UniProtKB/Swiss-Prot annotation:
Gene name linked to the record: atg3
Region feature Handle region, mapped onto this chain: 249-329
Lineage: Eukaryota, Fungi, Dikarya, Ascomycota, Pezizomycotina
Name by which UniProt lists this protein: Autophagy-related protein 3
Organism the protein comes from: Neosartorya fischeri (strain ATCC 1020 / DSM 3700 / CBS 544.65 / FGSC A1164 / JCM 1740 / NRRL 181 / WB 181)
Residue ranges with Acidic residues bias: 144-156
Renumbered residue ranges of the record's region Disordered: 135-156
Length: 353
């Protein structure tokens, strides 16, 4: 059944009519040209990502240029398997999570579905905070910080056999580090990006496909995420793939909320009575802050010229027409959203943001 589904999905993408009309702002979908633009931005801003070609000309799609058939990043670390500490474990109710921009009477469709965790998830947050590590500008993970209260005094415990803390049998959290190659392709049928994942136990030992599901949030397994052949390679290499059927609607919701958050921030800035107050408002980034750090970078020819009074006036004049997320920043936001499906895989390692 999986083979049939994979084959039908591939042919559906290749035979669907190609859209050349941009509906990015109204539908969350992008055209092949916009996918290339967003891919160029991702590669330019985050060099761990690169464009790649199909393994043979017969595997190429006509609506994307040769050499830019898909995007790939390699060797992304995955330090732990998903277990009951992550959302998606069976036996827990689902919960709709809304943000501050949604009213009390908002539709369930306007919120995020926190799968599997339900109310119990809040009780686990304190324990999970201990596993939080920082990411520097280069994308390197920082060391875990020990709780000072848990650090034994070596002078008091010297030669004290009872002071030696031994981990109970079966409770070890040490797990073999896996790595993943991530591939972003364009789905011509859904007109959105699509993510494929290929895992490795070591640089020379591929991870069996069924074991990749250990790194997928439980409620997504075999539903949103399935095992399929990668259409751009010869030989039928099996990968885990995040199905793109809901990508456009989720991205549209993110775009709308980012624009709303940006509008609120602009309104507050207009009412600011001092430079200090304006700086404070600017520091309180909302959803649009996902890409604020990359706002000054663009691959368009209209990139900023030399700084000066004239440029400041132009920015002031055009400010109301700006959007929170541009189409060339699409894949940056897409990867932030897709990370919720595979929280054990360190997606920020590929981006350093």
């Amino acid at each position: 059944m999986n083979i049939l589904h994979s084959t039908l999905s591939t042919w559906r993408d290749r035979l669907a009519p190609v859209s050349r009309t941009s509906t990015f702002r109204t539908t969350g979908q992008i055209t092949p040209e916009e996918f290339v633009l967003a891919g160029d931005y991702l590669v330019y801003k985050f060099p761990t990502w690169a464009w790649a070609d199909a393994s043979s000309p017969a595997k190429r799609v006509s609506y994307l240029p040769p050499g830019k058939q898909f995007l790939v990043t390699r060797g992304v670390p995955c330090h732990r398997r998903l277990n009951e500490n992550f959302a998606g474990d069976a036996g827990h109710e689902d919960e709709i999570v809304r943000d501050m921009l949604s009213g009390a009477d908002a539709d369930d469709g306007d919120g995020w579905l926190r799968t599997g965790g339900g109310r119990d998830l809040a009780e686990k947050q304190a324990e999970r905070i201990k596993d939080v590590r920082t990411v520097d500008e280069s994308g390197n993970m920082g060391e875990r910080e020990d709780d000072e209260e848990d650090i034994p005094d070596m002078e008091d415990d010297d030669d004290d056999e009872e002071a030696i803390i031994r981990e109970p049998a079966g409770k070890s959290t040490t797990q073999p580090i896996r790595t993943y190659n991530l591939y972003i392709t364009y789905s011509n049928f859904y007109r959105t990006p699509r993510l494929y994942l290929s895992g490795y136990l070591s640089p020379s030992e591929p991870l069996p496909p069924h074991l990749m599901m250990e790194d997928i949030v439980g409620d997504y397994k075999d539903k949103t995420v399935t095992l399929e052949d990668f259409p751009w390679f010869d030989g039928g290499l099996k990968m885990a793939s995040v199905h793109p059927c809901r990508h456009a609607s989720v991205m549209k919701t993110l775009l709308d909320r980012a624009d709303a958050a940006l509008k609120i921030r602009r309104d507050k800035l207009k009412q600011a009575h001092s430079a200090a107050e304006a700086n404070r408002i600017n520091s309180e980034r909302g959803l649009e802050g996902l890409v604020d750090e990359t706002r000054g970078l663009s691959l368009n020819e209209q990139q900023g010229h030399a700084a000066g009074g004239d440029e400041w006036e132009v920015l002031q004049h055009d400010e109301e027409d700006q959007v929170a997320i541009r189409v060339d920043q699409y894949l940056v936001v897409f990867l932030k959203f897709i990370a919720s499906v595979t929280p054990g895989i360190e997606h920020d390692f590929t981006m350093g943001v």
